Amino acid sequence: MRNRNGGVFVRSIAGDFMNGYEFQVYNRCHDGDVNRPVFWATGAIDDRQNARRLVSRDNEWFRMTIVANGPHLASWVNGVQVTDWIDDRKPNVNPRNGLRVEPGVIQLQAHDPATEVEFRRIVIQK
């Protein structure tokens, strides 16, 4: 399958649909250049920081590591760090509107009903 589009939401508000920091799962880049990923490429923090490069490919399992430590959020794909971001916005219970350091739920997303995204071997550490 091509154009798989999904995400992993962290620090989401319990009971609120997909409302947290979203780490993207989308294997696209400009003109086939992995050093020019689209803004929402795999590992990117949606609407906050683009992935530095595209490391993963469609139809291949990959490992994504997400760290959320205070205002610091970062991600690695197959061991390559692709984001490193400090949320310096004013605190807000809603992470779409400001810094949220409170724990929340983790949500897995397939972008729409036609999207097929699979997750396996999920490990959560505190």
Descriptions of predicted regions:
Residues 1-126:
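Carbohydrate-interacting regions of secretory-pathway proteins
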